[in-house]
Design a protein with these regions (language model features):
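Long, low-complexity intrinsically disordered regions
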Residues: 156-168
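Catalytic cores of histone-lysine modification enzymes
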Residues: 61-158
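Accessory low-complexity/Zn-finger-associated flanking regions
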Residues: 1-81
Length: 168
């Protein structure tokens, strides 16, 4: 099942800051407005610029615009179950997917581990010491990204409006 983003943050961020990139005056080169190499304060703090920001070329709205890499779920050949593979080259810093699922307490997570049993695949991702995302019964394809001793992805917490999102 595909889940909607359910992770919410009850604290307000205090409004979206305007970027100091010169975007409103057309001072930034095309494609660089709030991009990886820009001076966008929001991006440096892992806060996405909201649609209300006054420049249409903003490169810091990837989660809102679902600008994910093209990927595909596949059955692994080595008995590990399901995996996720890229259908295109992914560069360092690119957004692969958003990790989406049901947000539960760590106590609920422990109870679900007992309920699911040892043979049931689980897809938990800890947000902090008190909260966990459980993507076992509903979530995005990001739950099929497997552990690696030689990892090529990382998780990042991003603020989008009043929500906290987990980007990979």
């Amino acid at each position: 099942k595909r889940a909607q983003r359910v992770l919410t943050n009850v604290a307000e961020l205090g409004g979206n800051k305007k970027c100091s990139t010169g975007a409103g005056a057309g001072g930034a080169p095309p494609g660089s407005v709030c991009g990886v190499t820009s001076d966008c304060e929001n991006r440096h703090m892992r806060i996405e610029c909201l649609n209300s920001v006054d420049h249409k070329d903003c490169q810091n709205q990837r989660l809102q615009k679902k600008q994910f890499a093209r990927v595909e779920v596949f059955k692994t050949g080595d008995g590990r179950g399901w995996g996720l593979k890229a259908l295109e080259d992914i560069s360092s810093g690119d957004l692969v997917q958003e990790y989406i699922g049901e947000v539960v307490t760590t106590a609920m997570c422990k109870a679900r581990l007992r309920q699911y049993g040892p043979d049931t695949p689980v897809y938990f991702l800890a947000i902090n010491r008190k909260m966990v995302i459980d993507a076992s019964s509903k979530g995005s394809v990001a739950r099929f990204i497997n552990h690696s001793c030689d990892p090529n992805c990382e998780t990042e917490k991003w603020e989008v409006g009043s929500e906290t999102c987990i980007a990979i």
